[in-house]
From Swiss-Prot:
Quaternary structure and interacting proteins, as annotated: Component of the small ribosomal subunit (SSU). Mature yeast ribosomes consist of a small (40S) and a large (60S) subunit. The 40S small subunit contains 1 molecule of ribosomal RNA (18S rRNA) and 33 different proteins (encoded by 57 genes). The large 60S subunit contains 3 rRNA molecules (25S, 5.8S and 5S rRNA) and 46 different proteins (encoded by 81 genes). Interacts with snoRNA U3. uS11 interacts with MPP10. Component of the ribosomal small subunit (SSU) processome composed of at least 40 protein subunits and snoRNA U3.
Gene: RPS9A
Protein's organism: Saccharomyces cerevisiae (strain ATCC 204508 / S288c)
Listed Pfam families: Ribosomal_S4, S4
GO cellular component, one term: cytosolic small ribosomal subunit
CDD domains for the chain: S4
Cellular localisation: Cytoplasm; Nucleus, Nucleolus
UniProt cross-references to Gene3D superfamilies, sorted A to Z: RNA-binding S4 domain (3.10.290.10)
Additional free-text comment from the UniProt record: Present with 106000 molecules/cell in log phase SD medium.
Every S4 RNA-binding domain range: 107-181
Bias kind Acidic residues: ranges: 187-197
GO molecular function annotations of the record: rRNA binding; structural constituent of ribosome
UniProt-recorded name of the protein: Small ribosomal subunit protein uS4A
Length: 197
């Protein structure tokens, strides 16, 4: 059976000036604050933001009663509010232009897990997510960059299959428990022998 050709498009764009020191410092600070793996994660979100802002700018050039502006503008705003990037009281295209990369980074699963107190740090949150300890609702999510919707935020918790979520302890914990039980069993045997003498 023939396969349809897939067209892939880039999900990020690199900066035009690679060694601009002010931008490098800002990116490093962002990567540290949000526990990002590399700069590409920042570039990906910048790329998404630039597409959203371009769409908003295009719609703002049209007349307020233009059906395209009404339909597409409301759809864009509704999508951003659902993700939690735009607040309920700022439902205007002008506010879309004021969005920053940090607003999107705040909505990542990695950041949300840390903010909810399930992890000790953002880096620990990333490890928990990639090791499949975190679930959103009933679905285990192992992608740290997963964008959490506002209505899903309250469903973030440890997965039922995770030792942190009350499931069977991990391999090392089981081994340590067995050793402890074995040691306490030996101590009890020695105590019995001492009593007999």
């Amino acid at each position: 059976m023939p396969r349809a050709p897939r067209t892939y498009s880039k999900t990020y764009s690199t900066p035009k000036r690679p060694y601009e020191s002010s931008r490098l410092d800002a990116e490093l600070k962002l990567a540290g604050e949000f526990g990002l793996k590399n700069k590409k994660e920042i570039y990906r979100i910048s790329f998404q933001l630039s597409k959203i802002r371009r769409a908003a700018r295009d719609l703002l050039t049209r007349d307020e009663k233009d059906p395209k502006r009404l339909f597409e503008g409301n759809a864009l705003i509704r999508r951003l509010v659902r993700v939690g990037v735009l607040s309920e009281d700022k439902k205007k295209l002008d506010y879309v232009l004021a969005l920053k990369v940090e607003d999107f980074l705040e909505r990542r699963l990695q950041t949300q897990v840390y903010k909810l107190g399930l992890a000790k740090s953002v880096h620990h949150a990333r490890v928990l997510i990639t090791q499949r300890h975190i679930a959103v609702g009933k679905q285990i999510v192992n992608i740290p960059s997963f964008m959490v919707r506002l209505d899903s935020e309250k469903h973030i918790d440890f997965a039922p299959t995770s030792p942190f979520g009350g499931a069977r302890p991990g391999r090392v914990a089981r081994r340590n428990a067995a050793r402890k039980a074995e040691a306490s069993g030996e101590a009890a045997d020695e105590a019995d022998e001492a009593d007999e003498e």
